[in-house]
């Protein structure tokens, strides 16, 4: 009986480990995407800030961007177009916006022409979305 119980416990551990392996890989992929996104953020730094102590610049600070209402960063003077855009930032909306900000929200103030590489946009989102509203990391 003891041998059978040992086999069951061992089999359960193997199955649990196999189930967790893809999750560990996913975490590593997200971390890699965020690292790549950090490098891509260099294109944004002239106008935007993120992290502890970030302040509005030519563009709004981007802490807590995930699930934030568009045009709602305190203390930033948004264009009427972005104030009334009526969407919440999520990965899909961010990707659409970053491809061509002027097309997604005509009349917004963002001068950046956009990014064409979907993987770069996804990596940038992975980087930005790991910041809480106070600039701390999630």
Segments (PLM) and residue ranges:
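Electrostatic cytochrome c docking/interface patches
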Residues: 25-41, 51-52
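Bacterial N-terminal signal peptides that target proteins for export
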Residues: 2-16
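C-terminal capping alpha-helices of c-type cytochrome domains
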Residues: 16-17, 90-138
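Gly/Gly-Pro-rich "capping" loops immediately C-terminal to redox-active cysteine motifs
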Residues: 36-38, 52-91, 112
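C-terminal segment of classical bacterial N-terminal signal peptides
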Residues: 15-28
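The canonical Cys-X-X-Cys-His
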Residues: 42-50, 124
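Residue-level signal for the nucleotide or nucleotide-sugar donor/cofactor binding architecture
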Residues: 32, 42, 86-89, 116-119
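Envelope-exposed proteins and targeting segments
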Residues: 43, 58, 106-108
